[in-house]
Amino acid sequence: MKFGNFLLTYQPPQLDQKEVIKRLVNLGQASESCGFDTAWLLEHHFTEFGLLGNPYVAAANLLGATKKLHVGTAAVVLPTAHPVRQLEDVNLLDQMSKGRFKFGICRGLYDKDFRVFGTDMSNSRELMNSWYDIMTKGMIEGHVSSDNEHIKFPKVKVSPNSYTQRGAPVYVVAESASTTEWAAERGLPIILSWIINNNEKKSQLDLYNEIALEHGHDVSNIDHCMSYITSVDHNSNKAKDICRDFLAHWYDSYLNATSIFDDSNQTKGYDFNKGQWRNFVLKGHKDTNRRIDYSYEINPVGTPQECIEIIQSDIDATGIHNICCGFEANGSETEIIASMKLFQSDVMPYLKEKSNC
């Protein structure tokens, strides 16, 4: 079993930005002492939904402050920055950490990011393809060039080269079928969303495996990751109550982040995400409290035994044994770390990989 901790850097109303960033560093370091393998960092811009505009910089800090902890991005919005500049960042982190950096990528969801950084969001799929190809070639061969419709530059040497053979491991944050298929074609592990239930997780993995096998990949040893909102307490109601205020503000902040500009919903190529929101509305989840209640049904929020049952059910359905938990809904920094420690002592040891028998 592997266990990760994803760090939101959401700014709740009671904290200023200095406190959020300080807490990020402290929780990253606590991840190592609490037995987590990886701390995952999320990229966000122009909103309190996440204060981390550059996860590469934050990853460098946490890698330097820890000895064994892996640090990953979940995820870098790949199309919004130059691929060679990002390649240099990834290789440098890979070198300086001696292979402890994990490179999680996505094509992006927020119109605001593309608009401000001058990238055509409707072209995000093609840019994702091109940027990924350029970067992986540079990791493997040590030099890059490009002469396609998206970017042109002559052959250059990449420095530093990668520390890890064939480059830092790549993960893909995947929600839609098209992104799942894209990752499967390349045999890349995916990070599954915390907002989908057991059956949806299994269906996503079934789709992935079908496509990956068609492209000649061995699906038996791909390091997929399931993500969760997590709160552990011996009193189930207390675990749920302490999260509710945080999650209410966080969910509302997410909605605001998707619509900073009035015409954000006009972008082409994001039909899955629009459909997902329509389904949420039809299920009554537009109401914040109902959305939170549903989250509690599919995420490990409750007693240690309740958390074990929810996660183990997903492990048995999918075969995934890399579990990534987010604890920031648990209140103060002290309360967050207390929940992490209880997860370490009363949940981690009792989760088992799916038996192949």
From Swiss-Prot:
Keyword Flavoprotein: yes
GO molecular function: alkanal monooxygenase (FMN-linked) activity
One GO CC term on file: cytosol
EC number: 1.14.14.3
Recorded catalytic activity of this chain's protein: a long-chain fatty aldehyde + FMNH2 + O2 = a long-chain fatty acid + hnu + FMN + H2O + 2 H(+)
Source organism superkingdom: Bacteria
UniProt record similarity statement: Belongs to the bacterial luciferase oxidoreductase family.
Function: Light-emitting reaction in luminous bacteria.
Binding partners and assembly: Heterodimer of an alpha and a beta chain.
Protein's recorded name: Alkanal monooxygenase alpha chain
Species whose genome carries this gene: Kryptophanaron alfredi symbiont
